[in-house]
Amino acid sequence: MSLKNDASSSHDGGSNRESVIDDHGRRKSTCGYCKSPARSSISHGLSAQTLTVYDYQALIDRGWRRSGTYLYKHEMDKTCCPPYTIRLKASDFVPTKEQQRVSRRLERFLDGKLDVQPREQRGASSSGDVSDTRRKTLGAAKSEENKKVEAVMDDLSKNIDQAVQLCIRSGEFPSNMQIPKASVKKVFCARRKKLAEGTEQILYTSNIAFPIAAAIKRIQTSEKEGINSAEGNRLSPETISEMLLSAMHKVGETPDVSIKVCKGHINFLSSAKDSFSDRDVVPNGNISRGANSLDGSETLHAKKDSENHQARKRKLEIHLKRSSFDPEEHELYKRYQLKVHNDKPGHVVESSYRRFLVDSPLIDVQPSGDEKVPPCGFGSFHQQYRIDGRLIAVGVVDILPKCLSSVYLFWDPDYAFLSLGKYSAIQEINWVIENQARCPSLQYYYLGYYIHSCSKMRYKAAYRPSELLCPLRFQWVPFEVARPMLDKKPYVILSDIAISHNQCSLLAGASETLVEPAASEHEDMEQGETNDNFMGCSDEDEDEDEDDDDDDDDDEEMYETESEDSHIESDPGSKDNDINNILIGLYGSQYRYKEMRQIITPVGRKQLEPMLQSYRKVVGAELSERMVYEIN
């Protein structure tokens, strides 16, 4: 989905700047998840003065996470509630029926057809409510409509898949391409976007050309000689959609619809008035609904009486902007934290909000016009969701070279019935899919941390097929492979599971080794100290109207670690922890530690070297030699 974007207008992100960090060492704190009174949450902490998006990408692929300018990573074998980094390859995403229902529910609300009110307006007069009998009748009719629509979308998806296969057999697409499954979506809206001819209207749409374009570009960049590189360079999403259109005509007629392409999207249209097509999602644009905006005094309940058959229309806009303080966002954040998480007023003041969700060490990278940076650039962003101008949700995200990383989401408690946490995640996944055609390295959606014993985090694994990061070898392991062992104990060397179950082929297909064998990799967790009050919930909290997993948190007993001296994060590929090449910052100058060793007193070396050894273990050799370790 395309987003309105002024993101590249603020911050002058010089690409020549480097990462500068301060080391806080090992930290112990109380845990916001299991609520243990002991200081059982164990992590390593860093503060970043500045941080390149490339270094942060490497850090989160080693298990780190940021909260404001603070970076943290759990000692997975020792901490009470081990958090595993979880991610999803966006082009492989298959929405569940529940996730599809969330999208449809919001569309019905935008059309004024959802029989629901915000919390602040409930409990007034029930005289205008639809009777139980009529509600059941309407529900049954809607269910029948949805079945018919889903059957049509399934048929159209199969037609597209056949067209893709035809293009592969004809040599237009590479034969070794990983083929994403075609997804066709219903187009919803009251103001239908008419095409040039007659009264044809968009009923369904597919963005399959975007992941195909990204897959072809990945093949061309990974193979030295390339495959049809001269031709492939012209395979933009627009070109691919035209090729698929031609192939679909060869496959056979699609009854009751005509097919046209627009800006890379394959649109299915009808000249007949369709009882299921009275709503609209406009591809390649902001979600826009509307015509009659609501003022704050009006009810959000849809009018269904005989005097007003025309449902009130609402307009949804999604707006991406660089991270900065916005008083309106802060007010929404306060309402969310106080009502949803029962925070104390002293915990939601402006200074803590800035520190948690506005301040970012990431050095902005502006769009350069090439295929290495998306149109919005890289850095930290706030994504606003507005209905008729009213701010209802804000997603805090980091856009990095390989992923969109979800940091936090807060929303208007009056709109809890819209399941905005799930809806925003779906929009962010779609954003990755559409932008990877322009930036092929941008493939993944990171959902932060996953704690198997925390029921509020179970929803993250519902975005399938998801992967968890192994805390020892730092390979990505399919969640379904890891789940049986996580059911038994909280700390697991995930890559061992795949090997022991003879699932190497599955692991090779779904996983990616993120570093060379001799390098050390690591795991992530939420901030251990300054923001412990935020650790009781997930990065992007489950909506309160959604049921948690049936399993209670009865597996909170922590797996025993072997000894205080054991440390799983030691580099398995190195015999010692060579700190000579760590890059040190001192009074504005930079040195390798080996250049400083002779001028430091024995007492100073005794204090500093254990810190450097621990630092090198948790960030790895490569980053320790690239990021500046500040000493004041």
UniProtKB/Swiss-Prot annotation:
Pfam family, one: ATE_N
Keywords: Acyltransferase, Plant defense, Transferase, Ubl conjugation pathway
Highest taxon in the source lineage: Eukaryota
Bias kind Acidic residues: ranges: 538-563
Function: Involved in the post-translational conjugation of arginine to the N-terminal aspartate or glutamate of a protein. This arginylation is required for degradation of the protein via the ubiquitin pathway. Component of the N-end rule pathway with ATE2 and PRT6. The N-end rule pathway regulates seed after-ripening, seedling sugar sensitivity, seedling lipid breakdown, and abscisic acid (ABA) sensitivity of germination. The end-rule pathway regulates various aspects of leaf and shoot development. Involved in the oxygen-dependent N-arginylation of RAP2-12, an activator of hypoxic gene expression.
Presence of keyword Protein biosynthesis: no
Molecular functions (GO terms): arginyl-tRNA--protein transferase activity
Positions of the UniProt region annotated as Disordered: 1-27, 113-144, 284-312, 517-580
SUPFAM superfamilies named among the record's database cross-references: Acyl-CoA N-acyltransferases (Nat)
Start-end of Basic and acidic residues biased regions: 113-122, 298-310, 564-578
Name of the protein: Arginyl-tRNA--protein transferase 1
Enzyme Commission number(s) of this protein: 2.3.2.8
InterPro entries for this protein: Acyl_CoA_acyltransferase (IPR016181), Arg-tRNA-P_Trfase_1_euk (IPR017137), N-end_Aminoacyl_Trfase (IPR030700), N-end_Aminoacyl_Trfase_C (IPR007472), N-end_Aminoacyl_Trfase_N (IPR007471)
Biased composition (Polar residues): 1-18, 285-296
Biological processes, Gene Ontology terms: defense response to fungus; leaf senescence; regulation of lipid catabolic process; regulation of seed germination; response to abscisic acid
Phenotype of null mutants: Delayed leaf senescence phenotype. The double mutants ate1 and ate2 show reduced seed germination potential and inhibition of seedling establishment by sucrose. The double mutants ate1 and ate2 exhibit abnormal shoot and leaf development.
Reactions catalysed, as given in the entry: an N-terminal L-alpha-aminoacyl-[protein] + L-arginyl-tRNA(Arg) = an N-terminal L-arginyl-L-aminoacyl-[protein] + tRNA(Arg) + H(+)
Originating species: Arabidopsis thaliana
Similarity remark: Belongs to the R-transferase family.
